[in-house]
Regions:
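Anion-binding alpha/beta catalytic cores of soluble intermediary-metabolism enzymes, centered on
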Residues: 1-81, 85-199
Length: 199
């Protein structure tokens, strides 16, 4: 409904959501955790671009990995062709976005292991702070697991890609999460107003 009523940001065909995880290892961003079910190449490109902008908005430099069950085409027969194609498009058309994949989560989050096994990767020496998942099932399962395990303070879902500030909550959203999302909505509204007035 939000997509039809509010519309998508210019230059995109899809919107998404992300969650912010504050952990002992630092802050991480996960997308897309609530909207797109089985991501096509086009959807993955839009999700990566929107997430890149959002992470920068939160004053972090996005180092992004598209995660899967295989690494850099190691399973050519059943590998995630959508991720391969999305990575190719992002590297070609959006070179400012530092993204690589596909790779398993352990290689995304362990740069020593990643760089030793795959020295050709474009993230050499860098710590990944942003994970893009191949589908909603994987993304939502991971963040729900971390939430229940108490492994991180989680903020979200934060919508990215709609024309106006809007955020979603579920029936079991905590008061703290509602306060966090309300704060973000106010900030988003102020930014939106300033951008609108400049036009």
């Amino acid at each position: 409904i939000a997509k039809e009523v509010i519309g998508i940001k210019p230059g995109f065909k899809h919107f998404a959501t992300l969650h912010i995880l504050n952990t002992k290892r630092g802050t991480f961003f996960l997308a897309d955790t609530s909207i797109n079910h089985e991501n096509s190449t086009e959807e993955l490109v839009d999700i990566a671009r929107l997430t890149y902008d959002a992470v920068r908005y939160f004053a972090h430099y996005p180092v992004m990995a598209m995660v899967s069950y295989s690494n850099f085409g190691s399973n050519p027969e059943h590998g995630p062709i959508e991720i391969h194609n999305a990575i190719d498009i992002l590297h070609r058309d959006y070179p400012e976005i530092l993204v690589e994949g596909e790779m398993q989560v352990q290689y995304a989050l362990n740069k020593q292991l990643r760089d030793k096994q795959f020295p050709f990767n474009k993230l050499v020496g860098k710590d990944v702070n942003t994970l893009i998942f191949p589908n909603l099932s994987a993304a939502n399962t991971v963040f729900q697991m971390l939430l229940e395990m108490g492994a991180a303070e989680i903020v979200g879902p934060i919508q990215i890609g709609l024309n106006k500030p809007i955020h979603f909550t579920s029936i079991d959203t905590s008061v703290r999460d509602i306060v966090n999302l309300t704060t973000m909505a106010v900030i988003d509204a102020n930014v939106y107003e300033k951008v609108t007035l400049k036009k």
